[in-house]
Amino acid sequence: MTLNELDLYFRSFLKIEDYLMDVSKNGIQIQNSSPNGKQIKKVCFAVDACAETAEKAVQAGADVLFVHHGLFWPEIGTITDSVYKRISPFIKNDIALYACHIPLDANNPYGNNYGIAFRLNLKNLKPFGEWRGMLCGVKGELEKPLTVEELVEVAHSHNKNEKPLCVLPFGKKIIKTVGIISGGGAGEDDIRQAVEQNLDAYITGEAEHSSYHYIKESGINFIAMGHYYSETVGVQLVAKKLSEETDIQTEFIDVPTNL
């Protein structure tokens, strides 16, 4: 499989074209020397494209690095300083960079939010959480009602060493319904959607000081898993799918930010 064929493979289920309002340049961000000729033998997966993940991809012998947070956003201008440090390993080592942002948050069943929902064993799943006119989250009902503490434990069950960034138990003692928006979904407008839909708990990645009193006054349980940890889910699900359906080797590069 070549890089361009791999691009078509990812697009066949990640539905990148459905999220054109995304600020990320999704898809191939840095090509290799022969996108129609060079055979892809190994793809590494990571949450962030940065100097460290790029160097680790080089060390792992990767042909492609697939990330949730790529390098090309509207604010990227010149390739200098830290931007150069991030980009140069790809060019020097003929490694391609592939990014998938909001499509990977929203994807069912390979995205961050649905992946967390499956981990929680949520039922009756429905799209939830509008951003720029795009629904990128999910909501559902717990098969077995849980306390806040139990919900946190299950959410972090895949990595016992990763602790939640913030837990605000301001809602019902027994939780039956949950809304999920991974990553940076801690704004008041994000949380309001969970409140207005009468959800018992809201799970996201980050926590914002400015939302604290709104959460408390609205009487909802709020869990911030950590931006990084909440978005390790999708890249690993895509890696698993790729390894099961092709002969391409995969490897997850874990570079936690503890944020």
Where in this protein do the model-derived segments appear?
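Active-site catalytic microenvironments in core metabolic enzymes, especially phosphate/sugar-handling
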Residues: M1-L259
